[in-house]
Structures are given as C-alpha cells and as structure tokens.
Amino acid sequence: METRNQLLSRQREGWSLEQGFYLNPEIFDFEKEAIWKNSWLFAGFTCEIPNPGDYITYSVIDQPIVIIRGDEGEIYAHHNTCRHRGSVICTEESGNEPNLVCPYHNWVFAKNGALKNA
C-alpha cells in the first residue's frame, strides 16, 4: 500500500482524489487526529431527546457516545462506557433512563456523568 506522502506527491490541484486516499489506513489515522477529534460533530437533533432521561447513542471512530437530556433541559454527552470496567452503559440506540447504570457492577451515574453509587 502506498504511503500518504506517495499519494500526496501525485495529487494534482483541482483533480479528484485517487482511490488510495480513501483506503489508506495511514491517511485515516491522520484524519482521525487532524479532523474528527478536533471538530464539532453532528450527533443528533435535540427533538430526539425531548424529555429528561431521554438518550440517544452514537459512535465516533469506534468510540461509543451517549447523549442524554438532563432534568433541567440541559444536554450532556458522555463516553458510553463505564469508567470501572469499560462496559457499554446504554446498549439500545435510544431510550429513557432516570440514571445511567452500568450492567456489569451496577455503578450508577447521574445524567451529568457524576458517579452516584459504586
């Protein structure tokens, strides 16, 4: 597989990218760091979580995310994994939960991400 520099050396301004740009893992790793981890990403619409406890799940570059509506209408986004053992907390695409509960050891997190019970 060609390196990023080899592909870039042949790239002509104003022309579309060669197939290698879309398949090269080195380029994807670079884009993850330079673009995806440093930019705002669309995750959903606020109307998808209208009520306190409503949540949607989302994945960004293999990182599971949960977005949940707080009791006062605020919106929180967290890694959808327990900080204890890394278990996925919300396994459904969407739903409503009064708290975020890890299925592994039942650690309980508030909607704002604070640990309530361990």
What residue spans do the PLM features occupy?
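Rieske [2Fe-2S] iron-sulfur-binding domain
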Residues: 49-118
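Short, contiguous pre-domain boundary segments
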Residues: 5-18
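Peripheral, non-cofactor segments flanking catalytic/redox cores
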Residues: 1-7, 29
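A short linear-motif detector with a strong N-terminal bias
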Residues: 1, 19-23, 35-37, 44-46, ...
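Non-catalytic accessory segments flanking enzyme active sites
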Residues: 17-61, 65
